[in-house]
A protein has these predicted regions:
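Loop/turn-rich, solvent-exposed surfaces of beta-rich toroidal or solenoidal domains
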Residues: 267-270, 289-325
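Intrinsically disordered, low-complexity acidic/Ser/Thr/Pro-rich linker and tail segments
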Residues: 1-90, 94-101, 264
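WD40-repeat beta-propellers
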Residues: 100-104, 141-146, 183-188, 233-238, ...
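Canonical WD40 repeat/beta-propeller blade segments in eukaryotic WD-repeat proteins
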Residues: 76-84, 116-125, 160-167, 202-217, ...
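Blade-level signature of beta-propeller repeat domains, shared across WD40, Kelch, NHL, RCC1
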Residues: 343-367
Length: 367
């Protein structure tokens, strides 16, 4: 999927009408008192790491739309989705007011999309980091050329409520989980539906409630993991849509399912569960649990090949913490963030962790 114009211009696109807007540098704002407290409260318990440096701030700033009818009460738009580029220090964040922002390594930011519908998922492509796939709460799936902000193509899902999105490693397939209990797999080149996993009627046949997390196994292109509000984790062979593993476990209410090697993570909305770790070779009970005392809304493994670090974020205690599956306690992070943490992602090298919160700020951890 190649864009017509591959130059790195600064054109920003709102719907289909490109306009020229200067890139905004957001390095100037100073930390608020709350953010200063967060920085000084950040804890590193992991001496094996040479450094863990917390930096906040990529504060939400809207250079174009001063008046937002969706943002009643004057609150900052919330960050619901984050994706970090494979081989560059570029981060995409999706907001509750429909904006998508791109941040580069120089801490510049530009707006590339404004849909006025909440962005619930987005992914920068693995094979071409100039393309981003996003989905809105009303089912608009869009492929965007990041440097220019131009839409490459889009399609709309009708009569269903999407909750989550993931891309295959080759970026040729999009998987979407729905509030109605369905999972749909689309061809990303033709924007056509290829596979449909219907709502289950029993434990053995699928989900019976909202699906909030679906993820392709990046080491096995035929495998998919899903989790939902029905407290079920399911493993799927997408070649024949066969359910090859199932367990009653975490109550998944956000993007809290991930897989790495034989290990499967499930972050739970129930504070007593925290984050549960499973081994797919004996997929019956969790092999370990990690206490958080919070409602977990995001959970991801580090993408570095030779470690098994993961991070989780949520609310109640408004935390973001990172864990090593071989250690008992968290290794770095903090409680008492200014607002709930709804989304996070690691860079491919595992040296950057970005997480987004309900106050519109994108926080960064250099590892």
């Amino acid at each position: 999927m190649k864009p017509n114009n591959d130059d790195d211009d600064l054109t920003v696109c709102i719907t289909d009408k490109p306009i020229n807007v200067p890139i905004q540098n957001v390095d100037a704002p100073t930390m608020t008192p709350v953010e200063t407290i967060e920085k000084t409260s950040f804890i590193n318990k992991y001496p094996d790491l040479r450094k863990v440096f917390f930096r906040c701030l990529y504060r939400y700033q809207n250079p174009i739309h001063k008046e937002d009818p969706l943002n009643k009460g004057g609150r900052e738009p919330e960050i619901y989705a984050i994706s970090i580029c494979k081989d560059k220090d570029i981060i995409a964040s999706g907001y509750s007011n429909g904006e998508i922002h791109i941040y580069d390594k120089y801490r510049n930011v530009k707006l590339i999309q404004y849909s006025r519908e909440t962005i619930i998922g987005l992914k920068i492509h693995h094979t071409n980091n100039k393309i981003l796939t996003s989905i809105s709460s009303t089912g608009d799936v869009v492929n965007t050329h990041v440097p220019s902000g131009k839409k490459l193509n889009e399609f709309k899902i009708e009569n269903l409520i999407p909750r989550t999105l993931d891309l295959s490693l080759e970026d040729d397939k999009i998987v979407i989980g729905f509030a109605e209990g369905q999972i749909q797999i689309f061809n990303n080149n033709t924007q056509t539906l290829e596979k449909l996993i219907k709502k289950g009627t029993s434990f053995a046949t699928g989900h019976i409630n909202q699906i909030h997390s679906v993820v392709f196994d990046k080491q096995n292109k035929n495998r998919l993991i899903s989790g939902g509000r029905d407290s079920r984790l399911l493993i799927w062979d997408i070649r024949n849509l066969e359910n090859t593993g199932m367990v009653v476990g975490p109550r998944v209410c956000g993007d809290t399912v991930d897989v790495k090697g034989n290990y499967i993570l499930g972050g739970s909305y129930e504070p007593k569960d925290g984050v549960l770790l499973y081994d797919d070779r004996k997929f019956t009970e969790p092999i370990k649990s990690f206490k958080t005392d919070s409602h977990i809304y995001c959970c991801k493994f580090s993408k570095r090949e030779n470690d098994f670090i993961f991070a989780a974020g949520g609310y109640k205690r408004n935390l973001m913490k990172a864990f090593d599956i071989n250690k008992k306690d968290y290794i770095f992070g903090l409680d008492g963030i200014n607002s709930p943490c709804y989304s996070l992602d690691f860079s491919m090298s595992g040296t950057v962790l970005a997480y987004g919160c309900a106050d519109g700020a994108l926080r960064i951890v250099d590892i």
